[in-house]
Regions:
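Exported/periplasmic ABC-transporter solute-binding proteins
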Residues: 24-275
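Bacterial N-terminal signal peptides that target proteins for export
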Residues: 2-12
């Protein structure tokens, strides 16, 4: 039998190890679920990551509630939990998880592109949701009925606008206000319903291909620099929660999110990166 040199055997073993590592990288799947409000930004990041890493597998779920997402992460059913509010960072950390803040995004009053006003005052917002202003022509726009939309009271976008707009804090919405259960429901309704207005995020606006536009509030646009300087006050945080020591595939995705390339994706999708 022919003898094999130690160097040849070592090279063969190294080649096999490298092939195994590549195979593992192409088959490891990162499972992400949680806040549907954060999902559009994470979906954009996942698309960009896959373009750079064609073998990467990232699965984004259809949404989990505040407690359910952390429980799923703790039980190993998901690798990353998306969150925007209701997150007790100290408690999550105590349970052996790590919270990564990836961005801050403006909560906006988005309108269907057919609506013509570019700005609302806080008083006008409240009068719309109270049912006292019902046509855009009353605000200098076209003769088009206003279709007011809102998210459930437990959702972060509603929490933000009620907390930051004084006249909304205790306002009872008119019967005409339609409640959109999930963030994608709001995005679809704004894009497809003439005259509609509703609270959403700048990420949704940026991803709408011009079908949804964001209104300024009291003359202040929800622009990147205004979110950074906090002159635009309606904002919410975007968090990713992982195990304290995430699996290698998850760690690689997080590294991309924190990279210059990841930050460019965050900015392009209407959010402000947070290191």
């Amino acid at each position: 039998m022919q003898n094999r040199s130690p160097m040849r055997v070592s090279a063969c073993l190294l080649g096999l190890a490298f092939a195994a590592a590549v195979a593992a990288q192409t088959t490891e799947k990162v499972v992400i679920d949680g806040s549907t409000g954060v999902a559009p930004l994470v979906e954009a990041l996942a698309r960009a990551y896959r373009e750079q890493n064609p073998g990467a597998a990232i699965e984004i779920g259809k949404g989990l509630g505040t407690k359910a997402r952390i429980q799923a992460l703790r039980e190993g059913r998901i690798d990353v939990a998306m969150a925007s509010h209701g997150l007790n960072i100290a408690e999550v950390t105590r349970q052996g998880m790590t919270v990564h803040e990836i961005g801050k995004v403006a909560v906006v009053f988005g309108v269907n592109a057919e609506a013509t006003p570019g700005n609302l005052t806080e008083s006008q917002v409240c009068r719309i949701y109270a049912g006292k202003i019902t046509n855009w022509k009353e605000l200098g726009g076209s003769d088009l009925a206003i279709v007011p939309l809102a998210r459930p009271e437990s959702e972060v976008d509603t929490e933000v606008v009620r907390a930051q707009i004084g006249c909304l804090q205790k306002l009872e919405f008119a019967d005409a206000v339609k409640i959109m259960p999930k963030a994608p429901d709001m995005a679809r309704a704004l894009a497809s319903t003439p005259g509609s207005v509703g609270m959403t995020s700048m990420t949704v606006v940026e991803q709408s291909n011009g079908r949804v536009k964001a209104l300024s509030l009291e003359g202040i646009a929800p622009a990147h620099e205004n979110v950074q300087t906090r002159s635009y006050r309606l904002t919410r945080d975007s968090f990713l929660v992982t195990a304290a020591t995430p699996a290698s595939a998850t760690a690689r995705f997080l590294a991309f999110v924190r990279s210059v390339a990841g930050e460019k994706v965050i900015v392009a999708n209407g959010a402000v990166p947070v290191r």
